[in-house]
Amino acid sequence: MSIVMYLLAVLMMVIVDQAVKYWAVTMLASIGTIPLIPGVLSLTYLENRVAAFSILENQIWLFVALAVVILCGIVYALKTDKIQAPIGKISLLVIAAGAIGNVIDRVVNHYVVDMIQLEFIRFPIFNIADIYVCVGVALFAFYYLFIHKDAEEADK
């Protein structure tokens, strides 16, 4: 896949994330909560000024710097073909899209717009970019633990 295709894939994911957040700001904020599956899933507007577990409140530039470092690492890995398997490349693109989506919020709004609430467990409200990061990290862990190791052994 070419660098242009990588950029288009990330751009599409960021557009989806930002479109959902725009809807949340313009529509959901005035409503508050919309139950989708009562007792299971709802949409609840939240302006999140902290990271996971309420740490690093209002540390916008620390989050931005961390995201830039991660994005530089992803660009390096993709540009130098350090990651060969498609699942490894896809995982990095998904992580990049999530990082960019949340950085846009932090820089523009000084908070991240969250809206997805799982009601059946005690869990923080999250957004599409958070899903991208979690899914991307899970895919990368799978790649690293099972595929990367096999490819390395095959090269020996």
What positions do the PLM features span?
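Alpha-helical transmembrane bundles and membrane-interface segments of multipass inner-membrane proteins
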Residues: 1-156
